[in-house]
Amino acid sequence: MRSERPNLFFHAIDAFGGFEPRGDGAPGISIKVLSSDLDTDRKRGSRTRLLRLNPGTSTPEAHAHDYWEEIYMLEGEMTVHEDGQVKTVGPHTYAARKPGVMHGPVSSKTGCLMIDFCWYESGEDK
């Protein structure tokens, strides 16, 4: 399957403005999509986005995705429940999650900014 994502050459990204509330209505969490052809109905494609948690944000419960997810923390701190542990992570930390892996809830006293990569494996990749 050929990607629908456009070719993007290096360009400046505003890491402060232009964020939108996350689609599920989670308060205090906003996103800026950098590139995406992720189609959760057809279970294909990929997405790259910035994800911001405002200071004092917390999510109520654990969740899982049916796609791969990689997160790299750029700034701030976040407390996350994962793999039976509670961890506080900061800048230059990284997570990679296979489809179906439970994670969360999360919270951030200071606020944080992450880059989030999500994708479905194609039939040829499995």
Give the residues covered by each predicted segment.
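Glycine- and acidic-residue-biased ligand/ion/polar-headgroup-sensing regions
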Residues: 55, 64-83
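A short, N-terminal "cap"/entry segment at the start of jelly-roll beta-barrel domains
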Residues: 1-45
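Conserved short histidine dyad/triad with adjacent acidic residue
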Residues: 32-65, 98-102
